[in-house]
Structures are given as C-alpha cells and as structure tokens.
C-alpha cells in the first residue's frame, strides 16, 4: 500500500508523519511495525537516506504549543485544559496537551486539517472511542473537512475497517454535524 500511496502523491515526509501521528492514538506497540515498514520503503524502494528533514523544532515549549494547537483545532474551551479537572488525573490531560498536541500536531509535513482527518480515521477504525471520534469529527468540520468529505473518507475505508465501524463513524459524523 505504501507504493500505491506514493504513486498517488503521498510524500515520504507525509508517510512518516502519518505514522508518527498514529502513536498518540494507537500506541507505539501497534505503530512500531508500520514505522519500520515506512522506513524500509523509503530507503529500499525509493533509495532515500534516513533521517528525512526534521519536521519539529526541539526548542519549542511543548505545553504552550500544544495548547495553541488544541485551541486552534477545538476552540477556546481548550485553553487551560492541561491543568483542569480532577487533580488525580490532571497529569494525563497535561500529557495529552504537551505530547499529543505539542509533539505531534505542531510538526511540519501535515497541517491541522490533514492531521484531524487522519486522527478521525485512527479513532473510528479501532473502535471503542466514540466520544473522541465525535470530538474529532467536530474538529474536522470546524477546520473545513465537512460532513460530506468525512463520509467519503469513511466510504473509502470500508474495506479496511468493515461495515460496523464505518456505520459507527457515520453516526459520529452526524452527531458532530448537529452540535
């Protein structure tokens, strides 16, 4: 599938960024084999030398940049999210802001609109993430990936994820569109 993606215009940087984006949503244990596959494809098939051009700025304040990304994607209600809520679980909200959004969403190679579409796919494909899938469908719509576009994305993925998860994804899109 990497060769097909490449032939349809997905660049090596975009391939790597899609895999990196997956880590926060699927976990490194599920993503690592795909990172290896992408690296082998880039080196062995395309003949490029790794590492590719760096897509992040190691000098950025991850927490600050992560919050900026969350606000840009979801709206002002995300300001202060990293320090809000139950003190017993605030560390997870902080990790989400500085790791998921500060480390991944702030990288180059893909914009917010692309990352949100990809994130929505990761969430609905794995199932069991309905609240997050609705939130990210809503973020997609907010960024310009409208309901019709998201339904086309789901339609393209039916062979890979099956009908039950595809129907659940459409339900999430419809709920997000009503909010």
Tell what function each PLM region has.
Residues 15-19, 48-54, 100-101, 149-153:
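Short, charged low-complexity intrinsically disordered segments located at boundaries
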Residues 123-124, 138-143, 152, 156-159, ...:
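Short basic/hydrophobic patches in alpha-helices and adjacent helix-turn junctions
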Residues 8-9, 21-28, 56:
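Short gly/ser-rich anion-binding loops that grip negatively charged ligand groups
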Residues 2, 18-19, 114-124, 133, ...:
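Short, structured motif recognition centered on aromatic/hydrophobic residues
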Residues 3-7, 31-113, 142, 158-159, ...:
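Acidic, glycine/proline-rich low-complexity segments that act as flexible tails and inter-domain linkers
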